[in-house]
Amino acid sequence: MSTAIWILLIVLALIGGLFGGVFIARKQIEKEIGEHPRLTPEAIREMMSQMGQKPSEAKIQQTYRNIVKQSKAAAAKGK
């Protein structure tokens, strides 16, 4: 085989590997964020305290459930 064909094959393999790696990394990150949301009830409690509110535990849990529900809906819409 000529040198040009080898170079073309190497370039195509690199491009394919790049796209494959990006796709796999994206799926893993989406899965991780879906399983372990970055916003926790403790973080919500802290944010509400910083805004001058004294929220009840029920209000914190309600807010957390709404955020999780919205993130799952956004993830399902994106698929």
Curated annotation (Swiss-Prot):
One of the Pfam families matching this protein, by short name: UPF0154
Membrane topology: Single-pass membrane protein
Transmembrane segments: 4-24
Main location: membrane
UniProt key word NAD: no
InterPro entries in UniProt: UPF0154
Intracellular or extracellular location(s): Cell membrane
Keywords noted in UniProt: Cell membrane, Membrane, Transmembrane, Transmembrane helix
One term under GO cellular component: plasma membrane
Family to which the UniProt record says this protein belongs: Belongs to the UPF0154 family.
Protein name: UPF0154 protein SUB0399
Organism: Streptococcus uberis (strain ATCC BAA-854 / 0140J)
